Amino acid sequence: MTLFHFGNCFALAYFPYFITYKCSGLSEYNAFWKCVQAGVTYLFVQLCKMLFLATFFPTWEGGIYDFIGEFMKASVDVADLIGLNLVMSRNAGKGEYKIMVAALGWATAELIMSRCIPLWVGARGIEFDWKYIQMSIDSNISLVHYIVASAQVWMITRYDLYHTFRPAVLLLMFLSVYKAFVMETFVHLFSLGSWTALLARAVVTGLLALSTLALYVAVVNVHS
């Protein structure tokens, strides 16, 4: 039973990444090592973020919720956008190729570093726990999030982007950066359950994805 539970969690977490890699055409471009390079960049960016947070922002230990402090901590996630831009700027090719390489490499590195060990240790435990199913589902939401963020970075860094599109792209980037902060605040204020919080994150990420896709199609059509 425990091995079956671990297999379900592992498949739910990792197979969407494999399917995305195969179906997006990245395998035809031999982009595996490009994705690995994106993952290495992810590790470097996360190390810089941790050092910055540990130096300038103390850990919140309960009591009154520090709204301003948590907002400032969330602002550090701008470094992810900078890292994604760095990855895309070092890859030649079409826009969708750059976006998928950066997003898939970034999301896979996060999956391995933040969820691999908890799944291996926890999902193989004696007792069944829904939190590992939730963790696996959340990894799929993260994949969509990084695809969305990469598309936004690609659009905003186009030198020929029409000025009419720029405010919309910047707004979507702002929402992507502070989405986790907003969700955490709602969970804290309204004491949302784990499934409710996961559903809310999925809905918000889906809305951002649809908005970004519509804007991406408009930008590509205008500049084609």
From Swiss-Prot:
Gene from which this protein is expressed: Tmem147
Compartments, record wording: Endoplasmic reticulum membrane; Nucleus membrane; Cell membrane
Protein's recorded name: BOS complex subunit TMEM147
Expression across tissues: Expressed in cerebral cortex, submandibular gland, hypothalamus, pancreas, liver, and ileum.
Membrane topology term: Multi-pass membrane protein
Lineage: Eukaryota, Metazoa, Chordata, Craniata, Vertebrata
Keywords carried by this UniProt record: Cell membrane, Endoplasmic reticulum, Membrane, Nucleus, Transmembrane, Transmembrane helix
Function: Component of the multi-pass translocon (MPT) complex that mediates insertion of multi-pass membrane proteins into the lipid bilayer of membranes. The MPT complex takes over after the SEC61 complex: following membrane insertion of the first few transmembrane segments of proteins by the SEC61 complex, the MPT complex occludes the lateral gate of the SEC61 complex to promote insertion of subsequent transmembrane regions. Also acts as a negative regulator of CHRM3 function, most likely by interfering with its trafficking to the cell membrane.
GO cellular component: endoplasmic reticulum membrane; multi-pass translocon complex; nuclear membrane; plasma membrane
GO molecular function terms listed in the Swiss-Prot or TrEMBL record: ribosome binding
Disulfide bonds: none
Swiss-Prot/TrEMBL GO biological process terms: multi-pass transmembrane protein insertion into ER membrane; protein localization to nuclear inner membrane
Family according to the record: Belongs to the TMEM147 family.
Cytoplasmic side: 22-34, 89-98, 156-164, 217-224
Assembly and oligomerization: Component of the back of Sec61 (BOS) complex, composed of NCLN/Nicalin, NOMO (NOMO1, NOMO2 or NOMO3) and TMEM147. The BOS complex is part of the multi-pass translocon (MPT) complex, composed of three subcomplexes, the GEL complex (composed of RAB5IF/OPTI and TMCO1), the BOS complex (composed of NCLN/Nicalin, NOMO and TMEM147) and the PAT complex (composed of WDR83OS/Asterix and CCDC47). The MPT complex associates with the SEC61 complex. Interacts with CHRM3, CHRM1 and AVPR2. Interacts with LBR; promoting LBR localization to the nucleus inner membrane. Interacts with DHCR7.
Ranges that cross the membrane: 1-21, 35-58, 67-88, 99-124, 130-155, 165-187, 195-216
Lumenal topological domain residue ranges: 59-66, 125-129, 188-194
Major localization class: endoplasmic reticulum
